[in-house]
Every structure is written in C-alpha cells, then in structure tokens.
Amino acid sequence: MAGTKTGDFIELITPFLRRKMTELELRHGLNSPEWRAIALQYVKNPLEAAISPQERRRHYESEITIHFRDKPLAGVERLYRRTVLLEPTTVCAAHCRWCLRGQYPVKTLSEEEIVNAARYYGEAEECAEVDEILITGGDPLMSPKLLRVAFEALAAYAPNIRTIRIGTRVPFQDPERINDGLLSVLTSLPDRRIEIGVNVNHPIEFWPESRAAIARLKEAGATLYNQHPLLKGVNDDLAVLAELYSLMRETGIEAHYLFHAIPMQGMRHHRTSVRKGAELAGRLSASGEFSGRAKPHYALMTDIGKIVLYEGAIIARRPSDNTILLRSGYRLEDRQRWNPSWRVPSSVEIDDQGCMCVWYRDGEDEAWSDLGLWAGVNMPSNDSGLPANSAAG
C-alpha cells in the first residue's frame, strides 16, 4: 500500500528496481516478457484511467472506528476471529500499480497511537480470541523505528498475540533495507512466532540481492510465505507460476494465497477472469508436473474478506454486470461482534444458514494491444532505467 492525497496514485520506483529494469532491457529487449514482468507492476499506465461507474476507489471496509481509553483507534482493522491488523504507515519503497490501498489516504501513526492499538488488542473484550496480528501498510519495514514500537507495545500490553505477521515487498524492491538494525527488531521477541509475507509475483524478481535479503530474514528466525495477485501479462501463465513456486520453495518461502486481482479503479487491465485463475491453480495442483507441497490456495478478496475458491463456492452468475455470487462461512453476527464498526456492504446476501454470500466483479481475459498498453508512457532509458516522469524512490 502507498496511499494518495490527491486521488493520483503517483509512480514510485526505487533506484534498485530502475537498475534491474535497465538490465532487463539490455539483456532481453524493451517490451520483452522479462521487462514487462517488472514494468507492468511499477510503471504507471494510461489504462489505469479506464474506469467504469461500478468500480470503486476502495475495495472493502474493515477499519475499527471506535474510541478506546478515550482515544480514537487508528490504523486498526479486523475481519476475522483470531487476527487483527495494524498499519503503522502507508509509506512504501515503490508503488505497485495493482495496490489494494493505492487510493487510501496517506498516514503514519504516532507512537502513542501504536501503543493504544496494542492495549486494545490485549484488553478489549471483543479481542479475547485474538492471537495473531498482521502488521502491514504500506510497508512496515520502511520504518524499523515504528516496527520496534509495535513489537515493544505488543510485548507489554498484548500477551495474547503469539504470532506476528509482517507484510512487505522490501526484499524485492529495496533489499539493502534488510540490515542489522531491522533484524535486531525482528529478533527482539524470541517468544513470539514471526512470519513475513514477501509478495513476489514473477521468477525474474529473484535477483541475487533479493535472495540474500531473504536468507538474512530466515537467519533471523522468521518464517517466510508468499501471497500475491494473479496479474495479466505478468504471471497468468502456467510455466511462469510453476517456476515462481519452485524458486520460492528453493529459497524457503511457503506458498500461501494466489489472489485473483481485485476489482478496483485502474485495475481492469491487470485482471484475468476468475475462471482462468481457477484453471491455472487447478493445473498447478493436479497436473502431476508440479509438487503439491508448493502449491497456493486460489482466493478472491471480496467485500467481506478472503474466499478460497473451492468447488461450490460460486453459486450464481449475473452476466448483466459480469459478477458472480460467492458462498462464504462468515456469519454476520460474528463479524459485527469482532468489529463493532463494520457495516454490511450492499453486495451481501444472507443465506438460510446465517452466512454471508457476496457478489464479486469478474475480470476478462482479452489481451490489450502493445500500442494501447504503453501509449503515452515514457519508457526507461538505458542510462537511468526509469521513465522520465517517475518519482524518485
């Protein structure tokens, strides 16, 4: 996540990624599949302006907007029984063009707000079942200082939280940030389980520097996992996915979720159909060409949370607006108990078991033309490896 103040999700590419794009252009050629694998993730594209009236700037709502200890909670979200979420900052090293929170407001929590959140997790009645936190953003590894504050506050006020998960792309965007100072934070709570979700999308991203960063995180005792989107033109291909998951296994990164790309403004050119993702996931799992130990769960991030696409999960289709109705196990009464500020989205229907079903906008498998994709975009030069209109990383 990166956030925006003006509604314009600016392009932000690190010097590390600029160099890698230049190397890919020199080695494979401009517009080669290898170069595109990075450019489609980070280079701002005119197709982001292709927006339909049904598409939204925010995909789902999960913030807890209440006061605790006479102070407003900030950066706290919850959708699930045992897991809470904390966003210390929305700052990222680079801006992923498919970002779930790219259009959210820019914010960074104060130390006091982080401590108040930790007290809430440890003391609030509705958090009695919570034993896991996801620290995300933004990228928490962009601020080791705030991450240390969060670790210390959780140790002091939330002993119920035994697993600390961290979402980051730093190892693949700016791997030099995985330094001794950061590792000292990650090793400061030896009695807690530390898990790091690294979000890697294509095998080309396993650069030597990134492999070294991953090795350092593992040496610090963290368990690494990957959850990432299926992106048209980047990894919507069986051979690419098989190589990606093989490299993950080789470097000690567990497969978690393969997400269908979310239905948000500016995302249409990234989104395949749900069916294509299901077929790719099925071939990974059942073709005999790939180890089942390294396969992901194929999931959709809906208005009510993640839904893993098992047989029977799709219960209806509505061609008029290209949506599908998905069955979930989420009960409305539970959700509103876990998150007192949560409101039922208009996309939700309640089934006869009291569980929520949700309408979800499908994607399309038509390919964009090269001309339409890059029209108006300044390509990276061999000197800088960066589009001339890019922001500094």
Which functions belong to the PLM regions below?
Residues 1-34, 249-393:
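Auxiliary Fe-S-binding modules of radical SAM enzymes
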Residues 68, 80, 112-116, 178, ...:
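Short secondary-structure boundary/capping elements
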Residues 99-111:
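Iron-sulfur (Fe-S) cluster-binding segments and ferredoxin-like electron-carrier domains
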